Amino acid sequence: MRIIAGTHRGAQLVPVGDGDAGAHLRPTSDRVRESLFNVLLGGRFGDPVRGVRVLDLFAGTGALGLEALSRGAAHVTFVDDGTVAQRLITGNIARLKRAADCTVLRCKADALPAGQTCGLVFLDPPYGMNLGLPALRAARATGWIAPGTVVAWEERSAQIAPQGFRALDARRYGDTWITLLETT
């Protein structure tokens, strides 16, 4: 895995290896990550990355948030409660020397502490476990999400926009669906 574009283009991320079977780590492939950022930065949604705060829920390796930093995001908060994920995220932040621009929270994504509003949220829960919607609701209830926030939700199937959100786009990449939402 590597950073696709921006100031850290080509930087190799810490290898996941065999990891921990119980950690449910399923890193977003380089191809899907590149396609997601092409859609986000393609002009239809303005520029939801440059200069914004980003929330990376179920961060895993941190690749999505770090890609956003490489492309100009101001700050990323990574959320994951897994031991393996915490090690991968902190290792990748150290590799890119971006600790000053990152916060790593070890908590469940549906039990977030109060936070600063973010302009972009990556939501990448383990597939098929129905964890995405509770995490999205928690992020909104605790101040991480405000009107106009763009959410990129990665799941096994396209997601229906929950109350308080509108669907912007949905795309399939193999067995992965990315649903883009915006808070209303």
What are these regions (language model features)?
Residues 1-184:
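Class I S-adenosyl-L-methionine-dependent methyltransferase catalytic core
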